[in-house]
Amino acid sequence: MGILVILVDLQCCRCDAKIRKVLGCLEEEYCIEKVEYDVKNNRVIVRGKFDPEKLCKKIWCKAGKIIKEILIVDVWPPPLPQPPPPCKPPPCEKPPEDCKPKPCHCCSCEKPKPKPKPCHCEKPKPCHCEKPKPCEKPPPCKPEEPPKPPPEKPPPKPECKLVPYPYPVPYPYAGQWCCPKPEPPKPPPEPPKEPEPPKPCGCSHAFVCVCKPAPPPPPPCGCSGGHGNCGCGIRPWPPQVWPPPPVCPPPPWCYTEDNANACSIM
């Protein structure tokens, strides 16, 4: 029959619950018959038909953090120590008149020590010190503020970039034509020549022939010299052509809507 004495702090509720749970799990496996809990002395006595060394190792493995010590004993509670035998003086071989008992040097026969005398010192005077003030309550813990997000960076200012532009060569100046000068308009065509007078018919009339009547003169065309829709057969003048509009150069700098007075550099 094996007996184990386990030293545990049974005043602690967690340690008490832990050792009860461990011993309850090992009760059937190791044939534990009886478990006694001595709360005053913080001891647990385990009895049963088991191998004490194996059960001791198992309990150390399961609850080693709360156990102070495990004792393997044969008998519990341990037997009380027997009182020492009374000291008997050795028999005296001399006559009883000369025989005196020798002093005994055993522990039980020694004379008791005298009791200490009562102290006649003066009683300590009561202390007139001020009572200690109660401790101030600590201020309540403030909840930790969440970390503030980093400030947002301002958006970058728009940069003004110059875009290459193919300038005409030579560079056009204001008030001048960007294209070659137009050719002057051609003069109007000459009016048709009048037909030559008919040759004389060979008669005796010197200046005017009366033999044949003279052909009638051609009717006026009424085109006022332009010959636009006239049927006189003369081509009309070409229409007037205006010079092409000048080519304006691109602006030398780009334009932004930012306030120019906001920054001294701008």
Swiss-Prot record:
It comes from the Eukaryota. Keywords: Metal-binding, Plant defense. One of its GO terms (biological process) is defense response to fungus. Residues 1-68 form the HMA domain. Gene3D superfamilies: 3.30.70.100. Induction: By Magnaporthe oryzae. The keyword Secreted does not apply. GO terms for molecular function: metal ion binding. A metal cation binds at C12, C15. Residues 142-156 have a biased composition (Basic and acidic residues). Involved in defense responses. Contributes to slowing defense responses toward Magnaporthe oryzae. This is Protein PYRICULARIA ORYZAE RESISTANCE 21. It comes from Oryza sativa subsp. japonica.
